[in-house]
């Protein structure tokens, strides 16, 4: 495992290969229920097989809760983020983390051949980097211990 890993390596190690999504006309209440039930923080919003938006916990808090709106009477299309930042499976993990930091986002839908194939979170990326750094430290410790004339 290397820090130079790609998004595809993260998707390959995720517990589920299923990609959850929603549509614009679904109520926020239903979308939040799905997110809660699947323990995820965002849902790509789909129309005709294409990602047209993303709805996140932050969208819910800022556009429903803090505005006193009803989640049962509000459609996802009314609160979703329309300008979706996406990546391909070959995107570098560190580059994705930098992009998320620069744009203050926590989820990246993964698109391959125009099709949604997954989503990675900032947590997925951080876990991968920490794991890669741990492996590198172990390798260096092994090298130092073998090279030491103790």
Predicted feature residues:
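Tandem CBS (Cystathionine beta-synthase) repeat/Bateman regulatory domains
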Residues: 1-150
């Amino acid at each position: 495992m290397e820090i130079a890993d790609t998004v595809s390596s993260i998707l390959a190690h995720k517990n589920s290969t299923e990609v959850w999504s929603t549509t614009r006309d679904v109520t926020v209440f239903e979308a939040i229920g799905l997110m809660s039930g699947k323990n995820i923080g965002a849902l790509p919003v789909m129309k005709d097989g294409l990602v047209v938006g993303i709805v996140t916990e932050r969208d819910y808090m800022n556009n429903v809760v803090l505005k006193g709106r009803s989640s049962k009477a509000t459609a996802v299309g009314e609160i979703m983020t329309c300008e979706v930042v996406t990546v391909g499976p070959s995107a570098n993990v560190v580059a994705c983390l930098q992009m998320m930091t620069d744009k203050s986002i926590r989820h990246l839908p993964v698109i391959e051949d125009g099709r949604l194939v997954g989503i990675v979170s900032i947590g997925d990326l951080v876990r991968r980097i920490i794991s890669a750094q741990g492996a590198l430290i172990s390798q260096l410790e092994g090298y130092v211990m073998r090279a030491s004339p103790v």
